[in-house]
Amino acid sequence: MPYTFNFPKSQSSFKYSIKSLTNSRSFPMISIYVTPQSTPKFINNQSIDKMTVLSSFRSRNSFIIARSILSKLLRKNKADFKKVSKSVSLLWGSVDNSFKNYFEYLSILESQWHDKKSSNLNPISSTRTTSELNYIELCSSIYNQSRKHPRSVQGNKAKFRLYKNVSKKSNRKPRRLKNGFKVSRSTINCSYGIYTEDVFQ
């Protein structure tokens, strides 16, 4: 009875090693060295958006992995690159789904490895909480530096307070005009504090 390859059962926990994804009935794993395409990130004046950009390197698909593995076997007969690619393409079109599923499984493993590696190389900086903010960073105005200020904003001290200006405005009395004009005592107060007077003859 021919052996058919099946994907392992999916579980909720994420597998971090190849050994945990294989069992005694799995195909033998062939380790392939992948040249890292990422450059080391040094401390500089770049923005956070540029530092957290993922690498442009993509993991290989199932056919590329099959071609890289089978080309090592075909090149032992001193075949050139064109013959190797043509032979692998003919083989890929004539094999069953179990053969393709195996290399699809390898491509999933490689994509998981690449995602984990890229996330470790480019950690996203966590947002600063209010407990990490200094008192000096919160003040936009000048204050007395000789006075000891708290290092954090926790507690009920050194907090800014805003007071509403509730001072009374002096009400201007309407002027009394002579020479036959009478000014009404009623005034209209607009929001800008400008008084308008109704003059009746």
Curated annotation (Swiss-Prot):
Give an example GO biological process.
regulation of mating-type specific transcription, DNA-templated
Keyword Nucleus applies: yes
Report disulfide bridges, numbered on this chain: none
Q: What does the record give under GO molecular function?
A: DNA binding; DNA-binding transcription factor activity
Q: Does the keyword Repeat apply?
A: no
Subcellular location, record wording: Nucleus
Residues within the DNA-binding region(s): 56-122
Grouped into one coarse class, the protein's main location is: nucleus
A GO term from the CC aspect: nucleus
Keyword list (alphabetical) reads: Activator, DNA-binding, Nucleus, Transcription, Transcription regulation
Miscellaneous note of the record: The C.albicans mating-type-like (MTL) locus contains, in addition to the genes for the regulatory proteins (MTLA1, MTLA2, MTLALPHA1 and MTLALPHA2), a and alpha idiomorphs of a phosphatidylinositol kinase (PIKA and PIKALPHA), a poly(A) polymerase (PAPA and PAPALPHA) and an oxysterol binding protein-like protein (OBPA and OBPALPHA). Most C.albicans strains are heterozygous at the MTL locus and do not readily undergo white-opaque switching and mating, but mating occurs in hemi- or homozygous strains. Mating takes place in opaque cells, produces tetraploid progeny and seems to occur rarely, if at all, in nature. Conservation of mating capacity is rather thought to be due to the simultaneously regulated white-opaque switch, which seems to play an important role in host commensalism.
What job does the chain carry out?
Mating type proteins are sequence specific DNA-binding proteins that act as master switches in yeast differentiation by controlling gene expression in a cell type-specific fashion. Transcriptional activator that induces the transcription of a-specific mating genes.
Family assignment from sequence similarity: Belongs to the MATA2 family.
Write the protein's name.
Answer: Mating-type-like protein A2
Q: Which organism is it from?
A: Candida albicans (strain SC5314 / ATCC MYA-2876)
